[in-house]
Every structure is written in structure tokens, then in C-alpha cells.
Regions:
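Short, surface-exposed loop/turn segments at beta-strand-coil junctions that are enriched for proline
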Residues: 441-448
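C-terminal edge beta-strand
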Residues: 465-476
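N-terminal acidic, glycine/proline-rich low-complexity segments
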Residues: 22-397, 403-424, 448
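Low-complexity, Pro/Ser/Thr- and charge-rich linker/hinge segments at domain boundaries
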Residues: 192, 476-480
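Surface-exposed, flexible coil segments in extracellular/virion-facing regions
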Residues: 416-441
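Bacterial N-terminal signal peptides
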Residues: 5-16
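Short, solvent-exposed loop/turn segments at the edges of extracellular beta-sandwich modules
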Residues: 458-464
């Protein structure tokens, strides 16, 4: 959640402080389409998602098919996980009263198209899932409607097919403009159809084979980094065993851990995520808007049998970050720059993975522990606005010292330049900065540019929890 502070210091001149009201948290609204029972990872992702039901409004949970499960849907499996959630709900509400009733969630479990792909959509083929999507699209709600697609997308395709057949074009365009879709690759042939038939549809996807998608970074073992937080041993110790009925409902891995989770990670209000700006990066990865070439999507690799079509227009898809992780230091500053630099699309997600996993583990502990016995995330606040207007060559002070921790834990700070999120070509002069308050001199520019700086604040509780604040520097050329 973006929070506003009170002052900006540039050079030696302090501008007058102006109190700014903290904006209310607006929960994203989400409908999930899941081919649950195709493999265990959908159940794994659902366990995690329910722990964030206080932060994300779950408007529908739709059981669907996919190329991996072409016939039959399993709403009963969704309901079974919600029943485990019901057992721990009283304890969760000790940590946050916003957790919804299990009965409310159960009432939002419906079935989608009973068959596979485009062959299961058309006139007269509406399903409870497609009807739910239509109702949500036409609700008088100013929030976008996010649809996370963990399997096939044909229930969404049916909803938009019916919308197009029964509403005037202006109403269709207005409804589509409110949609935000994130699909875990294309798991049936309706995804490419949706992108082609509705060119204005906001769509995040890594088309092509499963070898190259950004979402795979949630579980993939990356050479040269510490992968313990996605190991089987970590999952047993922190999730499955001794963590109550919801943790016990988390199944063992069959192929990859939680391949569907990236579709909602970017909606969690952590100060870093900016759902309307996939190119800014966040827990769900970073994506750029362009038309990918078919040959760059590994079309001959494994897709489960879904044909890889040529994209006809720009979509939000794989982007590349250049990233050098920090590593712990025994003396002096607590962290130092690592020796290895990484440069690919997977980096955009796994760079946050330790924090993602620790957050999951902490929330699962909420299901068995009283608030005084559990850890809660720090609250990151700035002593200035989140967007600063400066000129090239200015000295800028960035200050997160008003940050605090609800449990009274000690806090560690790390400031990160995120060049890929902005337009500034020159590097920011920012090293391994670990103080709450830092200064830097902005590069000189010939044209207006933006630079993103992230402050990462981590407590020293167990497990250690991290929150962020993003500062956007709007840099103008020096005055003539």
C-alpha cells in the first residue's frame, strides 16, 4: 500500500512539511479459474491465497478444465480447502478481523465450462462460472476485476462471448476495460482467441512453452543462489507439518511448487506491488507491453498440446531484469553485493522469493498462534512523498525513518535502484545502502526521465518479514 509522508529535502534546502492523509487500502477484487485436481499445485496455491483473503476480495472461485484435464471439474476440491480454512478462521481473525466468513467463500465456488477449450463455448453454453464473471463485470464497482487463470481460460471466453452477443459495443468495451487477466501460460486454445477477439483486453501471459515463463521462477531451482525456501525440507518444516489443518492440507509437489501463485502475488499490498503497472515489477514478476515473436516463445517446447499462435497485438509478457543479489556479511554492513549478476525474465520474480516464502510461513503461523506469539510485517513510511520532482544534479534525501514494526522488532533497511521500472538511462549512484535515511545526487538528463528507488524494510522477527515503499523520482533537465 502506497503511503505518503511529510517532507522532501533537496540539497541544503528543506521544503516546508505538509501533512498528507494516508490513503485507505482498496482491496483488489479477484476471480480465480482453477483446474484443481489436475495436479497438486492448484491446491497449494489455494492454501496460500486463502491466507491473503483479508487483503484480496475473493469474488469467485471457479472450477475449470485445461489441456491437462479436458473433461470434468472439481468444485468439491475447492470447498474442501475452504473447510480447512474455516477451522482456523477464529485464530486468523485474532490477527485481522478482515478475514471473510468461510460460508461466504463457499457460496462463491462454482463450476466453469465442463469441456475443453473453444469447443466448449458458444451460444447457449453459459456456465455458473461464466455467469459469475458476467455479473462481476457489470457490477457498479469502480475497481478493476482481476481474473487469475490457473488452468484453461474458456470460462472467461464464454463470459465475453455472451457479453459480445447480448450487449451493445459500448457496453462490451466498457466491461472489457475493467478486466485484468493473468494466465499461467495458455492451458487451452481460448487464451489466444481472447487476445485476438478483444484487442483492448489487459492480459498478462508468457505464451509458448513452459521452459521460459516468468511464473516458473516461483519454484525453479536457480543456479548460484540460495534455493532453500522452495525446497521440500523447507515446505515440510514451515508449511505442512505442525502448522494446523490448513498447513496439513498443503499437498506434496508433483511437478512444480505453486505454479499458479504468481497470478495473484502482484495483488498483495506490500508497498512494492503496483498491479496497474506490470512494468514496475513486484512479487508476481515484471512484464512489459509488446508483441512477442512466436519464435521467441519456444513454440516447439512443452505446452501440454496447446498450439502456439502468432500474437496479433501487444500483451504484457516476459521482461528482463539485471540483478545482483546481496549476501549476508559477517562484519561491517550486514549485507554486501554478491559476486554473480543475473539477467533474464525469471529474475523479475525470484529476486523477491525469500520474502514471499517467509510471508507465507508467517501467515500460516497466524492459524495456530495468538498475535503476541507471531510475527507481523513492518509498516514502511516515508518522511516525504512517494513521487518527487527534482532536476538533474540535485541532491535528494530519501528517508524511511518513520517506519515501525507492530511487534516492536528491530528493522533492517536496504535501498534498491530499479532501473528497468523507469525511463532513466544513466545509473543512479546507489550502492549497498542500509540506513533508514540516505542521500544521492541525481544524474543530469537531456530530457525528462523517471527513476524508481525501492526501500526494503525487514524485521528481525521469525520468520523475518519484509515490506517496501517505492519512490519515483521525476527528473527534469537543469534549468537553462
Amino acid at each position: 500500500m502506497l503511503r505518503l509522508g511529510i517532507t522532501l529535502l533537496i540539497g541544503l534546502l528543506a521544503l516546508p512539511g505538509v501533512a498528507v492523509a494516508e490513503p485507505p487500502l482498496i482491496k483488489p477484487r479477484l476471480v480465480v479459474l482453477t483446474d484443481i485436481e489436475n495436479e497438486p499445485d492448484d491446491t497449494q496455491s489455494l492454501v496460500r491465497l486463502l491466507l491473503y483473503a483479508n487483503d484480496i476480495e475473493l469474488r469467485g472461485l471457479v472450477a475449470t478444465t485445461s489441456v491437462h484435464m479436458k473433461q470434468g471439474v472439481h468444485p468439491e476440491s475447492i470447498k474442501r480447502v475452504i473447510q480447512h480454512y474455516a477451522q482456523v478462521l477464529p485464530r486468523l481473525r485474532q490477527h485481522d478481523r478482515a478475514y471473510p466468513d468461510a460460508a461466504l467463500l463457499l457460496a462463491r465456488v462454482v463450476t466453469g465450462q465442463p469441456g475443453y477449450g473453444l469447443q466448449a463455448i458458444g451460444d447457449g453454453r453459459d456456465s455458473p462460472g461464466s455467469e459469475l464473471l458476467l455479473r462481476e463485470l457489470e457490477r457498479p464497482d469502480p475497481r478493476p476485476l482481476w481474473v487469475s487463470v490457473w488452468g484453461g481460460a474458456n470460462t472467461l471466453a464464454q463470459a465475453l462471448h455472451s457479453l459480445k452477443r447480448t450487449r451493445p459495443k459500448a457496453a462490451v468495451d466498457a466491461a472489457v476495460s475493467r478486466l485484468r487477466v493473468y494466465t499461467i501460460s495458455d492451458q487451452d486454445d481460448s487464451g489466444a482467441w481472447l487476445r485476438r477477439e478483444f484487442p483492448g483486453l489487459f492480459y498478462i501471459v508468457s505464451p509458448g512453452s513452459y521452459a521460459r515463463p516468468t511464473w516458473a521462477a516461483i519454484h525453479r531451482e536457480i543456479e548460484g543462489i540460495d534455493n532453500q525456501h522452495v525446497s521440500n525440507a523447507w515446505i515440510v518444516r514451515n508449511i505442512q507439518q505442525g502448522h494446523g489443518p490448513l498447513g496439513a492440507a498443503y499437498p506434496d509437489i508433483a511437478y512444480g511448487m505453486e505454479g499458479d501463485t504468481p497470478s495473484f502475488l502482484g495483488l498483495i499490498p506490500n508497498g512494492l506491488n503496483a498491479p496497474e503497472h506490470p512494468n514496475w515489477g513486484g512479487w508476481g514478476g515484471r512484464y512489459e507491453l509488446y508483441t512477442p515473436r512466436r519464435e521467441d516463445t519456444d513454440p516447439d517446447g512443452f505446452t501440454g498440446g496447446v498450439p502456439v499462435e502468432t500474437e496479433t497485438r501487444p500483451i504484457w509478457t516476459n521482461a528482463v531484469d539485471r540483478f545482483r543479489p546481496v549476501v549476508p556479511a559477517a562484519y561491517g554492513r550486514p549485507v554486501k553485493a554478491g559476486e554473480r549478476e543475473f539477467n533474464d525474465a525469471l529474475v523479475t520474480l525470484w529476486r523477491w522469493r525469500e520474502a514471499i516464502q517467509n510471508d507465507f510461513a508467517a501467515r500460516l503461523l497466524w492459524t495456530t498462534r495468538a498475535p503476541a506469539e507471531a510475527n507481523h510485517a513492518p509498516v514502511v513510511r516515508l518522511a516525504h512523498a512517494t513521487e518527487l520532482h527534482v532536476r538533474g544534479g540535485d541532491w535528494v534525501t530519501l528517508d524511511a525513518s518513520p517506519s515501525s514494526d507492530p511487534d516492536g522488532d528491530s528493522l533492517s533497511f536496504l535501498w534498491l535502484a530499479y532501473p528497468e521500472a523507469g525511463t532513466l538511462k544513466a545509473p543512479l549512484p546507489l550502492g549497498t545502502e542500509v540506513q533508514a535515511r540516505i542521500g544521492l545526487r541525481t544524474p543530469e538528463v537531456d530530457a525528462p526521465a523517471t527513476a524508481h528507488v525501492i526501500v526494503q524494510v525487514t524485521d528481525k522477527g521469525t520468520p523475518a518479514l519484509t515490506r517496501y515503499q517505492r519512490v519515483i523520482l521525476h527528473i527534469e533537465p537543469k534549468a537553462p
